[in-house]
Swiss-Prot record:
SUPFAM superfamilies: S-adenosyl-L-methionine-dependent methyltransferases. It comes from the Eukaryota. It comes from Arabidopsis thaliana (Mouse-ear cress). Its EC number is 2.1.1.-. A motif (Nuclear localization signal 4) lies at residues 655-662. Strongly expressed in tissues with high cell proliferation activity that have a high demand for ribosome production such as guard cells, leaves primordia, root apical meristems and the basal parts of lateral roots. This is 25S rRNA (cytosine-C(5))-methyltransferase NOP2A. The active site is at residue 494.
Amino acid sequence: MPALTRNKKKAATKSITPPTKQLTKSKTPPMKPQTSMLKKGAKSQNKPPLKKQKKEVVEEEPLEDYEVTDDSDEDDEVSDGSDEDDISPAVESEEIDESDDGENGSNQLFSDDEEENDEETLGDDFLEGSGDEDEEGSLDADSDADSDDDDIVAKSDAIDRDLAMQKKDAAAELEDFIKQDDVHDEEPEHDAFRLPTEEELEEEARGPPDLPLLKTRIEEIVRALKNFKAFRPKDTTRKACVEQLKADLGSYYGYNSFLIGTLVEMFPPGELMELIEAFEKQRPTSIRTNTLKTRRRDLADVLLNRGVNLDPLSKWSKVGLVIYDSQVPIGATPEYLAGYYMLQGASSFLPVMALAPRENERIVDVAAAPGGKTTYIAALMKNTGLIYANEMKVPRLKSLTANLHRMGVTNTIVCNYDGRELPKVLGQNTVDRVLLDAPCSGTGIISKDESVKITKTMDEIKKFAHLQKQLLLAAIDMVDANSKTGGYIVYSTCSIMVTENEAVIDYALKKRDVKLVTCGLDFGRKGFTRFREHRFQPSLDKTRRFYPHVHNMDGFFVAKLKKMSNVKQSSEEGDDDAVETVEQAEVSSDDDDEAEAIEETEKPSVPVRQPKERKEKKNKEKLAKSKEDKRGKKDKKSKSENVEEPSKPRKQKKKRREWKNEIAQAREEKRIAMREKAKEEK
């Protein structure tokens, strides 16, 4: 008999079990052991696990005809065994045992007669089939577990192999890269970049400047100068690259040769490009809160409500605000007109912060207009003490007085004097602190005034330096070294030129008894202690420089001096000599020899004493005349002396003239030799 599937076996059991249940209920009373056994048999009605169901479904075969015949035979069997006497406890126990042995959960109940008569009974086939399926299921489960373990091991091995391959590839790539670098260092590629020839430069000069070409050439030259050994153009020197860089920067950005040459000497190529690019951009607008009338937080809230986008300036300032954009004119708001804030660059805060004024002090602002620094000093002093706000130019006095009134400053006296005359007006050794924001070339604020690129020359820089030295000496003379709270001078400029900054401070250190002290600013670069052929005092590293590409503010210089005594190191004659040396410095380098010759000719010589000698001779002549009547012989001798004495200065004059001519000839020969050497070097 072919094997039955699970579903068909269930159908067979359904057709057989109902009559048996009815018989047991109607004819025989329920017994406790039987009911318990039936309950155990009922547990076998649970469905087998899904895994086994799927496997059994796969093994199914179509047996529709067999089902029909089986159902009829089984119905006959049930009808034959419908009597209560035929059903015994032994039979029921056997049926329950058969149901317990099979894990497929069949509920069929068969008698012993049916098992003997039918060779191919449903129970035997079902039980045999169920046992085989259990064994197959357990084997399949074990095989699945083993296969999963094998898959995990295989995957882990594959991952390990991939990692090993990646490490090998990375090591090989690194070795190749190192080899390429070594080859590049040994044999640089000269064909990558070359300087233009004279013919190419002439062709470029004929037409308008080719800005893209200039830009790329500037970038290539800067790249080569950063690492000249590796990126050196073929058959070129570093000097040639620097000269070409100066020319290209001047034509591309619009600088004159003097200014761009000075910047090239001050900064390395990479930083030079950052500085020049920063000069092409505007610095952010900043304002200073007037603490005499309001607080920064309150002012910020009011301006935010008016549509002003702002932030605190920085950690180093407690009163500054940065304005990004505004829906209203920032210089015409009601708060501005009421004096709650001052439009002021961030770099202008620094000199006042370095000065650190205290209450009830006497302070001088030598160049006060338009009043940003003066009003800041008054706010820090809380309108106590006394401030002398001096401005030499009359037109600028209007803006100074207007800002003082608007900001509510009441402790300031406005005066109009030349700063060099202030020690005579205010007196020497009479004030506690002096702020000198000296007039300068403005090379640190090119972003505000682009005319500086082409208007400033070496002669103008030297004139500014001469004026700055005189103003600084006057400022030092006004300060009282014995002041209990002060005795400080702050010197600042909006220039980045060494001639206007470190050179001026070095000059003051030599002429007055002062020393440099720290500015009290936590940021900023140290000043130069050496530049070109100049060597300054080591203490100049206490000065501070500020650049737009580093600190995002205008170029600025700040130095703070402490006066040690009220005694001058040099007399007035020394000051005059100092002025003469400055005037000589204004002479060009080609005329240095001529300047030396002029100095020597202008020096006081022996003929200056001639008037005194003549007076003495006249007195002698008078005495001789008075004695002529008494002594005639002596008169003759006196006459002979008078005749001989005038001959001496004449001989001396001849000697001096010859001496001057010889010196002039020697200097001309030196000039000619130096010019010939310069031509040969070129």
